């Protein structure tokens, strides 16, 4: 899939976030990357054979105190090649992009992987 098309899928997934949540994402940058770097894989605790579809790097809203401010934006990376590798069709890519964006946005709101499992997000 061309990068521009993939980027539009990510933008559509972000645009579908309800306004009450989107309003709390003013210091979050969402990036499309081909694949994770070695450092990003290490940060996520991902082994060399595992796939990393997305990554949130920053300070979740639940961890911010009154001291928080004047900081670089949190970052959400969405990895195109990783997502394409686990999908068999464009429809699956569309759904996986949506799922991955929402998963990483959930981390921004302080929801960890264990809680996402409990909520049935997987």
Which positions does each model-derived feature cover?
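Active-site rim/adjacent substrate-binding subdomains
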Residues: 1-96, 108, 112-117
């Amino acid at each position: 899939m061309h990068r521009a098309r993939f980027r539009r899928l990510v933008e559509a997934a972000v645009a579908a976030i309800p306004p009450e949540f989107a309003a709390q994402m003013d210091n979050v940058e969402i990036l499309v990357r081909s694949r994770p770097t070695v450092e990003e894989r290490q940060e996520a605790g991902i082994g060399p054979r595992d796939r990393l579809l997305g990554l949130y790097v920053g300070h979740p809203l639940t961890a911010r105190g009154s001291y928080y401010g004047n900081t670089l934006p949190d970052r959400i990376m969405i990895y195109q090649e990783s997502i394409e590798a686990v999908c068999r069709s464009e429809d699956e890519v569309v759904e996986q992009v949506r799922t991955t964006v929402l998963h990483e946005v959930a981390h921004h709101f302080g929801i960890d992987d264990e809680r996402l499992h409990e909520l049935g997000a997987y």
